[in-house]
Curated annotation (Swiss-Prot):
Annotated propeptide span(s): 26-109
Identification of the protein by name: Neuroendocrine convertase 2
Species of origin: Pongo abelii
Compartment list: Cytoplasmic vesicle, Secretory vesicle; Secreted
Gene Ontology annotations of biological process type: enkephalin processing; insulin processing; nervous system development; peptide hormone processing; protein autoprocessing
Annotated keywords: Cleavage on pair of basic residues, Cytoplasmic vesicle, Disulfide bond, Glycoprotein, Hydrolase, Protease, Secreted, Serine protease, Signal, Zymogen
Designated gene of the protein: PCSK2
PANTHER family: NEUROENDOCRINE CONVERTASE 2 (PTHR42884:SF13), PROPROTEIN CONVERTASE SUBTILISIN/KEXIN-RELATED (PTHR42884)
Active site: D167 (charge relay system), H208 (charge relay system), S384 (charge relay system)
Keyword flag Magnesium: no
Principal subcellular localization: cytoplasm
Amino acid sequence: MKGGCVSQWKAAAGFLFCVMVFASAERPVFTNHFLVELHKGGEDEARQVAAEHGFGVRKLPFAEGLYHFYHNGLAKAKRRRSLHHKQQLERDPRVKMALQQEGFDRKKRGYRDINEIDINMNDPLFTKQWYLINTGQADGTPGLDLNVAEAWELGYTGKGVTIGIMDDGIDYLHPDLASNYNAEASYDFSSNDPYPYPRYTDDWFNSHGTRCAGEVSAAANNNICGVGVAYNSKVAGIRMLDQPFMTDIIEASSISHMPQLIDIYSASWGPTDNGKTVDGPRELTLQAMADGVNKGRGGKGSIYVWASGDGGSYDDCNCDGYASSMWTISINSAINDGRTALYDESCSSTLASTFSNGRKRNPEAGVATTDLYGNCTLRHSGTSAAAPEAAGVFALALEANLGLTWRDMQHLTVLTSKRNQLHDEVHQWRRNGVGLEFNHLFGYGVLDAGAMVKMAKDWKTVPERFHCVGGSVQDPEKIPSTGKLVLTLTTDACEGKENFVRYLEHVQAVITVNATRRGDLNINMTSPMGTKSILLSRRPRDDDSKVGFDKWPFMTTHTWGEDARGTWTLELGFVGSAPQKGVLKEWTLMLHGTQSAPYIDQVVRDYQSKLAMSKKEELEEELDEAVERSLKSILNKN
């Protein structure tokens, strides 16, 4: 498949984003969903038009004048366009545009079968929830957990926070979920009704969302199943996965559903993790995400949590446009002894990790949570289980400080996540140019709920975010079969302009490249401060030789806090012994961050923390720059 930007970088609600389009050699699939724009009139007019032509209708909350029409008399998926219905709408003088939605695959992630702290819970599975409090259960490593006990003891349990589970529905009648279910914030986009109950199957395949919901919001001390990470939070069901094919309208509607009621959206799904797919959000979904981080939660921004992917060493989550988005917090997983799970994908866009299973046959090494029809399970797994745990931790932080923005949450994640006893046999732990420790698979470490709520209490909103095109290489360059193509870009990060970026958050390398075998490409980028990010690692199952990457935005978080000014280096080469050919057609450097120091005004309570180290670095840099300005002033006067 192909993803890329079909237009220039667009300004949308104050953000730059890339409009991706995707092409496939397979025949397209057409659904019974239509995107309709009217010449004028509001929802009443849209309902009238829809009714006259046999459609149901929903207004799209993130786009003025656009409507979601659906026709229950049409097949949900077929190979031919419904030209009759499309033309019927287009002939109506009130209709400006009607576009039948194509379907595409989205897969659930990780659906597999497989007491030192004085926290007393009577829930029968609580002692098996090692990811909450790890005392060595199932041969785990004591102390390797989310440190929720400290957050709970400080009084934070997620009260006043709502998490939306975007999935195959949730069993909202489950006795461990019913008291925390937020019906007002829930919706079924698969059936277009307000009841997101899972569709029954003999194999209980649609238990995925219910399991995720229990990890976040299962009630405490009710003698049922286990305990949610944020057990006093509310959970909303957004049923959107259970149809033959996904559409842009359904994704966009789900991501933008009730953004003033839902604080955190948890997604344990994405493009197929087969090691050869390159895919991401379409135009409406990108628009909805941009709208969410700008306008959600009263302007503080919706918080999107994404499972990084289950393709293992055969895949790279930078080929997933959801997990690698700047607007999402991408979460990987570790097992209960700190090792990587066999299905873990690695990439430079992953921000942090939580826990799941993935190596051990012991059933108690899985994630204990709620299951369909009032049941419980010990067998939830994959990064599907990791993302809801993170959503629960973020709910605890929001209870500590409801004023946190979507970017504040990312900064808190970077600063409070810990290496703990995580172990990656492939990628070493390294420090970036400002001393922040990271790993290519685990990101900045495992979430620490206690540390996060304590820092969140005192947190001051980070400075305004700016975006700078740091430079671009547009001349085609051949990639040698052996050795590497090495290119450099020297940038001032827009210094002296309104959009100057001094302290980095996210960096994107927008790349167009073709190769005789896409899966053998390896791409690294090194910052001016010497931090190397692996933008793309080998994907042995990817045999593409025609499509390549078309303006694909590879993203890294590994240069967080660094100074973007200076020379950036891009290296492209092939892994493997077979002769190869390739051409790099474009490399554009996109810098995102702040002009002023983000941590200089923060309260430091732990002088051994990453915050203390980062603040010290900022103060020294501010002093150096002040001295330099004074010297220049003196020299100019003389």
